[in-house]
A protein has these predicted regions:
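Hydrophobic transmembrane alpha-helices that form the pore/transport pathway of multi-pass ion
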Residues: 1-53, 254-294, 304-318, 362-367
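Transmembrane helical cores of multi-pass ion-transport proteins
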Residues: 6, 10-12, 16-20, 25, ...
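Membrane-interfacial loop-to-helix junctions in multi-pass transporters
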Residues: 12-19, 62-64, 118-120, 158-163, ...
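Membrane-embedded alpha-helical segments of transport systems
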Residues: 19-43, 57-78, 120-124, 128, ...
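Transmembrane alpha-helical segments and their short flanking loops
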Residues: 36-65, 73, 149, 275-278, ...
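Transmembrane helix-loop junctions in multi-pass membrane proteins
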Residues: 45-50, 82, 134-147, 178-185, ...
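Long, contiguous bundles of hydrophobic transmembrane helices that form the permeation core
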Residues: 54, 69-155, 167-191, 317-324, ...
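Core transmembrane alpha-helical segments of multi-pass membrane transporters/permeases
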Residues: 117-126, 131, 154-221, 238-250, ...
């Protein structure tokens, strides 16, 4: 994304710090609410004794951090304002300084242009991938054996469905590129190892997360925490989603991995609420995912943060410091929303309240930032 969008944002005088934030904000926050993703498969695998994929889908409307991050990107773009350190970089970008760090651009990536390329050549493979993954998940759920659509999707094996969908989408994409003579079959095959290499870190993180989960399970951590909370929390159970959100955020920030946070917290959340309050369990699982993504989003040692700054060719420290006020703003609004959601558990009402808080918060910040600029 960074290599594709750099020429576009440079021509519109958008700073590299702003570009890196937009890349980072459209990475994990989008993946965590996308049913057709490896994140859905990972989260589903941490929910034992339950329909993991169904729980993931039901938790999407309660994932306030991801939803509010998207809303924030839209609002600061439409209202055309920035605050914190980002404001300085955007002001300098309008004057032609896209970096503001006294360092010249080091574009070490080679750019290849194909005169026969079209926009459809980029969009069509993505659409084919989505369709194939959906069909793969329906196949794993028994849809083509007579199971109805809803039951097949809810009972699907996300890992199998995504793997099948990816394989067929890859084959169709290679066939399409060869027929369009954009790339030869050999060139397509030469690109495959780079895709495999790109997934190695994610596979290692997931493997370590499963290992950590197995260790906590062997120690009986989930049962211990569940029993302790059930005895001590009492009427304060409604506050747990907000508390879980904070714990997940701090844990992911310290470790730099959201998937590892999933592996630790989700089994504990399921053990606490599974037999007592299923609705609060959904909200708490979503709070766990939201907190993990929040901490991962702003952690300087997170792989997504590092890749975002590298993709935008922005200094890593600059990216971390400029996006931190934005992350804290969304995290604060999400925390307040989870506090209310523990008592008001209606999906639509909470979405209205949450988005209203987000808009009001940004409006106040916009007014304060505007007053500082005119002062």
């Amino acid at each position: 994304v960074g290599s594709v969008m750099r020429p576009v944002t440079d021509s519109h005088k958008v700073s590299r710090a702003k570009l890196s934030y937009l890349i980072d904000a459209t990475a994990a926050p989008i993946c965590i609410i996308a049913p057709i993703s490896s994140w859905a498969a990972a989260v589903s695998g941490f929910v034992e004794g339950e329909d993991g994929f169904s729980i993931f889908v039901r938790a999407i409307p309660y994932n306030y951090y991801a939803l509010f991050t998207i809303a924030m990107m839209i609002l600061i773009t439409v209202w055309n304002f920035d605050y914190g350190p980002m404001a300085k970089y955007e002001t300098n970008a309008l004057k032609g300084d896209l970096f503001s760090d006294s360092k010249e651009e080091k574009d070490t990536q080679r750019t290849f242009e194909n005169p026969n390329g079209r926009v459809l050549d980029l969009i069509l493979p993505v659409l084919v991938l989505i369709v194939c993954c959906v069909l793969g998940m329906l196949y794993s759920g028994g849809f083509f054996s007579g199971v109805d659509f809803v039951s097949a999707f809810a009972g699907s094996d996300a890992s199998v469905g995504l793997a099948l969908g990816s394989i067929f989408a890859l084959l169709l994409t290679i066939l399409y590129y060869c027929l369009r003579r954009i790339m030869s079959f050999r060139e397509c095959c030469d690109c495959l190892p780079y895709g495999f290499k790109a997934m190695v870190p994610a596979i290692l993180i997931l493997t370590f997360a499963w290992t950590l989960k197995a260790m906590t399970d062997s120690l009986g951590a989930a049962d211990f925490v569940a029993g302790t909370i059930s005895q001590a929390a009492g009427n304060l159970m409604a506050l747990l989603p907000a508390i879980i959100f904070l714990i997940g955020a701090f844990l992911a920030f310290a470790t730099g991995t959201s998937w590892g946070t999933f592996g630790i917290l989700i089994p504990i959340v399921v053990a606490v609420f599974q037999n007592t309050d299923p609705q609060l369990m959904i909200i708490s699982i979503s709070a766990c995912m939201a907190g993990a993504v929040c901490g991962d989003h702003c952690s300087p040692i997170s792989d997504t943060t590092i890749m975002a700054s590298a993709g935008a060719q922005c200094e890593h420290v600059t990216h971390v410091t400029t996006q931190l006020p934005y992350v804290i703003t969304v995290a604060a609004v999400s925390f307040v929303t989870y506090l209310i959601a523990g008592f008001v558990r209606n999906v639509l009402i909470m979405l209205v309240i949450g988005f209203a808080l987000m808009v009001a918060t940004l409006y106040v910040i916009k007014q304060i930032a505007g007053n500082k600029q005119t002062a």
